[in-house]
Every structure is written in structure tokens, then in C-alpha cells.
Regions:
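C-terminal and inter-domain tail/linker signature
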Residues: 1-134
Length: 134
């Protein structure tokens, strides 16, 4: 893995700073299908997710890998947080979630150009009490 790719990905994983993204970046939560385009829109999404919907959110990084030939980085992590605000129309439940996630990042010129985030939406909804446990 190029050191620059690893540095950018790990910096973002620790900070969730929208400045890690290129101005014209694209962020896709694959479970939702609709990409978020542009750093400002990504910043709004990150604020909603990490400060409003899950005010104590954190990610426990498990693995970081990359394809050095294409400046692709991959992070496997577990997202933890207490649901304290509206998320996709679901009012705060106070429930704690623990969701396995995988992020795929395309890095260019020291910034994230594209992110695709994979996770199981049904697991998230179950943990929020929106789907039956089985």
C-alpha cells in the first residue's frame, strides 16, 4: 500500500473530517444506493451521522489494505453508537448499535475521491428495533 493512501485513509477513519475528501468527491452508502456528491454534502452527511443520529459514534478499525497499483484503500471496521437523533426518518431510540462495515476508498492527490461504504441495512434496522430480531 502506498504510504500516502494509508495515511489519508487512516486520518479519515480517526477524524471523519470532510477535508479528507476532494471538492468533487462522491460518497455512496451502498445500502442506500444514492451517492452523495461534493465535499459540502458529504460534510452534512457526516455531521448528521456522527454528531446527531449517533452522538457518541466511533469506529473500531480492524484491517486496512490497499491496491497499490490503483490507489485504492480498504478499511474493515465496526461502527458503534447510541441512536440519539433522527436517522432516515427513524426518531432516536436510545438503542446501541454495533455494525460491521467495509469502506472502499479511491485516493487521488492526497484526498479521497470516491468512497463506497458497505454494511447490512437489515442488521442496522434490527438493532434500532425497526425489524423483528429473526
Amino acid at each position: 500500500m502506498s504510504q500516502e493512501t494509508r495515511r489519508v485513509i487512516e486520518q479519515y477513519a480517526r477524524s471523519h473530517d470532510p477535508q479528507c475528501f476532494a471538492e468533487d468527491a462522491e460518497f455512496t452508502q451502498v445500502a442506500l444506493l444514492n451517492p452523495i456528491e461534493g465535499r459540502d454534502a458529504i460534510a452534512d452527511m457526516l455531521r448528521l451521522f456522527y454528531q446527531e443520529a449517533f452522538s457518541d459514534a466511533r469506529g473500531d478499525l480492524r484491517h486496512v489494505a490497499a491496491d497499490t497499483g490503483q490507489d485504492l484503500g480498504f478499511i474493515e471496521f465496526t461502527f458503534h453508537g447510541q441512536h440519539t437523533g433522527d436517522l432516515m426518518g427513524i426518531p432516536a431510540t436510545g438503542r446501541t448499535v454495533d455494525i460491521a462495515m467495509l469502506g472502499v476508498y479511491e485516493i487521488r492527490d492526497g484526498l479521497i475521491r470516491r468512497c463506497r461504504l458497505y454494511y447490512d441495512m437489515a442488521t442496522l434496522l434490527r438493532q434500532l428495533g425497526q425489524l423483528p430480531a429473526n
